[in-house]
């Protein structure tokens, strides 16, 4: 029969790929309550520990008192409030660009930017490991769509030689499932030499990379000429919600006119923008957060490598432990949970077949002692997978 959803769901269960939503019963933080169980969490993207920061909460409360709780309309009607505008100005300053444009989600920002910039007769080239929202944007744009080998400037160059029309090269800044950095200097050189624009989604780099937290573009010392289109999200290191596109005056004005996900949606609550303004202030001022996070990353990598765990080449808070088999990844996640630790198993189709993993994420809110607890639990649990295979 048509729409045999039960069969599709059963097939996913049989392949150990069925997803379920854990119920969070506490605020974000290193220690959470999930499905009634108190756990030490290593799976949140709250990289700087700002999601439950008292000053950010107070800013939201004050914003609700001053501006109410609803955006009321789209930005182009009567939904563009003063706090929205102030956030855009703060983001432009943080990223060193003339303008920034606020979107309600990262998915919308990626779809909006790509579909506004390229269409039929144009070309969009993407890293094969890009986030789903980037791939969807490329497919929806109607442009000729192709993917180059992961983080491979030579592969990109060969595809650029066959490009037609306006050409947009799209890459994650930090790859969300591997934690590695895009080779932006090389990609920018290749794109510029062939007259293409480079678009970078820095969802996981903003706040964690760069001296001021400006992200991967600041990390590599690049500018708007190297990366004309910069995307960032506010629900990860910033600890609030939303996203933005930053670039030239002409780029932002073009998105206001042509980016459908921006035009045809109600603006985010202005009180949320008030909270984001405070989180951006803390992100820049409290540099100790990035310094402490970097120390935790070193601690985890050194400890995991001593155990012989298979890590990715990641200098970021994303530290995947590659298992391979989906059932085994789920088993390791369950073993850790039995010991009071929450580490999510990531399986296909989110990652390529045969590369299921535990995606460990670290936060500036974690302590060295908590990271050591994770390492101790891994040392106890990981060998049980090998014993099961024996």
Swiss-Prot record:
Q: Which GO terms describe its molecular function?
A: 8-amino-7-oxononanoate synthase activity; pyridoxal phosphate binding
The residues the record assigns to binding substrate are 19, 131, 350
What residues bind pyridoxal 5'-phosphate, as annotated? 106-107, 176, 204, 233
The enzyme's E.C. designation: 2.3.1.47
Instruction: Name the pathway it acts in.
Output: Cofactor biosynthesis; biotin biosynthesis
Question: Which branch of life, at top level?
Answer: Bacteria
InterPro entries attached to this UniProt entry: Aminotransferase_I/II_large (IPR004839), AON_synthase_class-II (IPR050087), AONS_Archaea/Proteobacteria (IPR004723), AONS_Proteobacteria (IPR022834), PyrdxlP-dep_Trfase (IPR015424), PyrdxlP-dep_Trfase_major (IPR015421), PyrdxlP-dep_Trfase_small (IPR015422)
Record flagged with keyword Transferase: yes
Q: Which residues form a coiled coil?
A: none
- Post-translational modification N6-(pyridoxal phosphate)lysine, affected residues: 236
Gene Ontology terms: biological process: biotin biosynthetic process
Gene3D superfamilies named among the record's database cross-references: Aspartate Aminotransferase, domain 1, Type I PLP-dependent aspartate aminotransferase-like (Major domain)
Reactions catalysed according to its record: 6-carboxyhexanoyl-[ACP] + L-alanine + H(+) = (8S)-8-amino-7-oxononanoate + holo-[ACP] + CO2
Top-level enzyme category? transferase
Q: Which cofactor does it need?
A: pyridoxal 5'-phosphate
Q: Which UniProt keywords apply?
A: Biotin biosynthesis, Pyridoxal phosphate, Transferase
Q: Which SUPFAM superfamilies match?
A: PLP-dependent transferases
Q: How does it assemble?
A: Homodimer.
Task: Please give the function described in this protein's UniProt entry.
Answer: Catalyzes the decarboxylative condensation of pimeloyl-[acyl-carrier protein] and L-alanine to produce 8-amino-7-oxononanoate (AON), [acyl-carrier protein], and carbon dioxide.
Family, according to the entry, reads as follows: Belongs to the class-II pyridoxal-phosphate-dependent aminotransferase family. BioF subfamily.
Protein name per Swiss-Prot or TrEMBL: 8-amino-7-oxononanoate synthase
Q: Which organism was this protein described from?
A: Pseudomonas putida (strain ATCC 700007 / DSM 6899 / JCM 31910 / BCRC 17059 / LMG 24140 / F1)
| Gene assigned in the entry | bioF
């Amino acid at each position: 029969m048509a729409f045999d959803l039960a069969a599709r769901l059963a097939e996913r269960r049989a392949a150990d790929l069925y997803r379920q939503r854990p119920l969070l019963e506490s605020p974000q933080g290193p220690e959470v309550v999930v499905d009634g169980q108190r756990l030490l969490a290593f799976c949140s993207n709250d990289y700087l520990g700002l999601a439950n920061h008292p000053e950010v909460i107070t800013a939201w409360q004050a914003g609700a008192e001053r501006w109410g709780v609803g955006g009321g309309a789209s930005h182009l009607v009567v939904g563009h409030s003063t706090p929205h505008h102030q956030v855009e100005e703060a983001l432009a300053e943080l990223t060193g660009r003339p303008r920034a444009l606020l979107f309600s989600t990262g998915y919308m920002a990626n779809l909006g930017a790509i579909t506004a910039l390229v269409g039929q007769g144009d070309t969009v080239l993407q890293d094969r490991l890009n986030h789903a929202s980037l791939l969807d944007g490329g497919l929806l744009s109607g442009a000729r769509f192709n993917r180059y080998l992961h983080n491979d400037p030579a592969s990109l160059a060969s595809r650029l030689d066959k490009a037609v029309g306006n050409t947009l090269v799209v890459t994650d800044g930090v790859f969300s499932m591997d934690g590695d950095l895009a080779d932006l200097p090389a990609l920018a050189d290749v794109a510029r030499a062939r007259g293409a624009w480079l678009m970078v989604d820095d969802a996981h780099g903003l706040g964690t990379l760069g001296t001021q937290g400006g992200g991967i573009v600041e990390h590599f010392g690049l500018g708007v000429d190297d990366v004309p289109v910069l995307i960032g999200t506010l629900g990860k290191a910033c600890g609030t919600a939303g996203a933005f596109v930053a670039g030239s005056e002409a780029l932002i004005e073009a998105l206001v006119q042509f980016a459908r996900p921006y035009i045809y949606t109600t603006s985010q609550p202005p009180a949320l923008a008030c909270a984001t303004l405070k989180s951006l202030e803390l992100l820049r001022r409290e540099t100790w957060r990035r310094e402490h996070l970097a120390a935790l990353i070193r601690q985890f990598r050194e400890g995991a490598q001593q155990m012989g765990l298979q890590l990715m080449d990641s200098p970021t808070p994303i530290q995947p432990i590659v298992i391979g088999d989906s059932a085994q990844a789920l088993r390791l996640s369950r073993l850790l949970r039995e010991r009071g630790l929450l580490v999510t198993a990531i399986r296909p189709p989110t990652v390529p077949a045969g590369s299921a993993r535990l995606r460990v994420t670290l936060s500036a809110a974690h302590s060295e002692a908590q990271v050591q607890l994770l390492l101790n639990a891994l040392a106890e649990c990981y060998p049980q997978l090998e014993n099961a295979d024996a």
